[in-house]
């Protein structure tokens, strides 16, 4: 039975820099990043060019504003579970749940719309990002030896057909 917490997301400092993975992703994906205070891991504000929608979003940490920018698992945790993660060790699930290759800062509404959907059922509305998105899904599924349904394969092939010399990301 799928349980999100078995992937350990957000409680882990994978790169041992003292910051949880959410802060690492925000610091990587936002521009004009400002931290709460000097030497802090906590991102106070920044500008996200959302890859899923193409919109620019001003991120400001706060109870009413932080959800505007969320961290998405490109291959959703539930999709990974259904694709083979159910048989992994605890350590491998932690690694997957916190793998920077599989994490992107995105518009909260787009992340909620996507939910646990695979590329067969959801693609970014920003068509110029679809090649990168599908390539990243393939890279993650390949890295972790996750299965791909026939519907996913058709959707991925359809998108990649229009991508000239698309390469798989490795980080």
Regions found by a protein language model. Give the residues of each.
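Short, small-residue-biased leader/transition segments that mark boundaries at the very start
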Residues: 1-2
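Short acidic, Pro/Gly- and aromatic-enriched capping/linker segments at domain boundaries
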Residues: 6-9
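Acidic, glycine-anchored loop motifs typical of Ca2+
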Residues: 16-18
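Beta-strand-rich, non-transmembrane domain signature
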Residues: 25-27
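A charge-rich, low-complexity, intrinsically flexible signal that marks solvent-exposed coils, linkers
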Residues: 37-46
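Domain-level detector of nuclease and nuclease-like folds
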Residues: 43, 52-171
């Amino acid at each position: 039975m799928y349980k999100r917490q078995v992937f350990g997301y957000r409680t882990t400092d994978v790169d041992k820099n003292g910051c949880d993975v959410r802060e690492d992703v925000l610091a990587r994906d936002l521009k004009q990043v400002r931290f709460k205070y000097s030497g802090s891991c906590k991102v106070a504000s920044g500008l996200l060019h959302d890859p899923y929608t193409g919109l620019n979003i001003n991120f400001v940490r706060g109870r009413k504003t932080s959800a505007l920018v969320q961290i998405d698992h490109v291959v959703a945790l539930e999709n990974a579970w259904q694709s083979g993660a159910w048989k992994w060790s605890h350590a491998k699930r932690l690694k997957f749940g916190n793998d920077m290759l599989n994490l992107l800062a995105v518009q909260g509404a787009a992340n909620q719309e996507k939910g646990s959907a695979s590329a067969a059922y959801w693609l970014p509305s920003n068509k110029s990002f679809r090649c990168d998105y599908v390539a990243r899904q393939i890279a993650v599924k390949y890295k972790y030896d996750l299965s791909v349904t026939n519907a996913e394969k058709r959707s991925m092939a359809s998108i990649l057909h229009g991508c000239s010399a698309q390469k798989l990301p490795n980080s």
